Amino acid sequence: MTEKRTEITIYTDGACSGNPGPGGYGIIILSEKKRQELSGGYKLTTNNRMELMAVIVGLEQLEIPSIVNLYTDSKYIVDAVTKGWAKRWRANSWKRNKKDKAMNPDLWGKLLDLCSKHQVEFSWVRGHSGNIENERCDKLAVKASQKLDLPSDLGYQ
């Protein structure tokens, strides 16, 4: 008998002032039993790294393999996962093609590993269009990016 997987909904967003510049991410995790909000930031990073970090940190919170409905306003993430780009980049030693390297291989590797543990359905939501949970994630991300004494994003530098 197989164990029924828990269904989880995750909303994520990343923000960066300057790109590169100080950045942050915001996450909302919804389950049958609770709502959890998380955020964090780095002093020098990019918007795409913060979008990726939001998804990674959200998935890292799940203690058991789960069915995840993940909502992000990052077409970069949705397309790279659903169109198989990220898996191809990894298979090609983190190259997009023969001469161009894939960006953020440290984070893409983590994300692909996490996706192999869970059943993740990625969905794109239009940013700043009134989606309440996405708007809240944006506020969390911006606030996190404005904190003092943010750590370094070692993968970026």
UniProtKB/Swiss-Prot annotation:
Which parts of the sequence bind Mg(2+) 2?
Answer: 13, 138
Keyword annotations of the record:
Cytoplasm, Endonuclease, Hydrolase, Magnesium, Metal-binding, Nuclease
Q: What is its main location?
A: cytoplasm
Q: Which cofactor does it need?
A: Mg(2+)
Question: E.C. number, please?
Answer: 3.1.26.4
Q: Which region is the signal sequence? A: none
Chain ranges passing through the membrane: none
Domain RNase H type-1, by residue range, is: 4-146
Q: How is the cofactor bound?
A: Binds 1 Mg(2+) ion per subunit. May bind a second metal ion at a regulatory site, or after substrate binding.
Q: Where in the cell is it found?
A: Cytoplasm
Residues reported to bind Mg(2+) 1: 13, 51, 73
- Write down the InterPro entries for this protein, in alphabetical order: RNase_H, RNaseH-like_sf, RNaseH_domain, RNaseH_sf, RNaseHI
Q: Which GO terms describe its cellular component?
A: cytoplasm
- Protein origin, superkingdom: Bacteria
Name which cysteines form disulfide bonds. none
Q: Extract one GO BP annotation from the record.
A: DNA replication, removal of RNA primer
* GO MF terms held by the record: magnesium ion binding; nucleic acid binding; RNA-DNA hybrid ribonuclease activity
Matches recorded under Pfam families: RNase_H
Which reaction does this chain catalyze? Endonucleolytic cleavage to 5'-phosphomonoester
Subunit comment for this entry?
Answer: Monomer.
- Main role? Endonuclease that specifically degrades the RNA of RNA-DNA hybrids.
Q: Which HAMAP family match?
A: RNase_H
- What's this protein's family per the entry? Belongs to the RNase H family.
Q: What name goes with this protein? A: Ribonuclease H
Q: Which organism is it from?
A: Trichodesmium erythraeum (strain IMS101)
